[in-house]
């Protein structure tokens, strides 16, 4: 039986962790951030976050070998 493939779009955007949570980086900080957003908006977009439990289930299906 062939190996199952990971969804390429998911592996570029999400990182499944050993704890079972899925880490991601927030959208909206690539460009056009100098004049379109306030300092508060940019501050909240910084860093990474974990997915909500309902979204987590859908994304975990894209990673067949994640624990």
Curated annotation (Swiss-Prot):
- Extract one GO cellular component term from the record: cytosolic large ribosomal subunit
Question: One Pfam match, by short name?
Answer: Ribosomal_L35p
Is-annotated flag, keyword DNA-binding? Answer: no
Lineage top rank: taxon: Bacteria
State the residue spans of region: Disordered: 1-20
Name its GO BP terms in alphabetical order: translation
Q: Which UniProt keywords apply?
A: Ribonucleoprotein, Ribosomal protein
State any single GO MF term: structural constituent of ribosome
Tell me which NCBIfam families the record gives.
Answer: rpmI_bact
Query: What is the similarity comment for this entry?
Result: Belongs to the bacterial ribosomal protein bL35 family.
Known HAMAP family for this protein? Ribosomal_bL35 (MF_00514)
Would you tell me the protein name for this molecule? Answer: Large ribosomal subunit protein bL35
| Source organism of the structure | Anaeromyxobacter dehalogenans (strain 2CP-C)
Quick one: which gene encodes this? Answer: rpmI
